[in-house]
C-alpha cells in the first residue's frame, strides 16, 4: 500500500523512473474501477457464449496493461482500506479469493459491486487450479 502521505503520481514516478510511463500508470490506476466492471462484463459474455475465447482474450488484453499491475494495485488498496489485508496476504494467489475480497471491500467502502454471477463463474473457472 502506498504511504498515505505520498500520492500515486509520486509513488509511480519513484519506482518507474520514466515520467511518461508513470503518468500512464496513474491513468490506468485512476480508471481501474471502471476497468474491473468492464472485465466482469467481458468474462460474463464469454461465460454466456456471447463471445469466443479469442475475442475474450483480445478484450481482456486491452484492460490488462502491464500484466494488470495498476488494476491489482488498485484492488489491493481497496482491500487493505477495508481492513482485509491479512486475508489478502493469505489468498492473493487465488484469483477467485482476490476478487471475493475485493467484493467484500467494496461492500465496506460502498463502492461499485461485482455480481454474484461473475464471482460464481470465476470460482468455477479457477477451482480446479486453486484448492
Regions found by a protein language model. Give the residues of each.
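Zinc-dependent metallopeptidase catalytic helix centered on the HExxH motif
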Residues: 1-30
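Pan-zinc metallopeptidase signature
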Residues: 20-131
Amino acid at each position: 500500500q502506498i504511504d498515505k502521505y505520498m500520492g500515486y503520481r509520486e509513488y509511480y514516478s519513484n519506482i518507474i523512473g520514466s515520467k511518461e510511463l508513470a503518468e500512464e500508470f496513474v491513468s490506468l490506476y485512476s480508471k481501474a474501477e471502471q476497468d474491473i466492471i468492464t472485465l466482469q462484463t467481458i468474462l460474463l459474455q464469454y461465460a454466456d457464449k456471447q463471445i469466443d475465447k479469442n475475442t475474450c482474450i483480445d478484450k481482456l488484453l486491452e484492460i490488462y496493461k502491464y500484466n494488470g499491475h495498476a488494476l491489482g494495485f488498485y484492488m489491493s488498496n481497496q482491500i487493505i482500506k477495508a481492513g482485509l489485508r491479512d486475508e489478502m496476504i493469505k489468498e492473493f494467489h487465488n484469483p477467485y479469493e482476490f476478487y471475493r475480497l475485493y467484493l467484500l471491500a467494496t461492500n465496506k467502502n460502498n463502492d461499485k459491486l461485482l455480481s454474484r454471477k461473475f464471482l460464481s463463474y470465476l470460482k468455477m473457472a479457477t477451482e480446479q487450479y486453486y484448492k
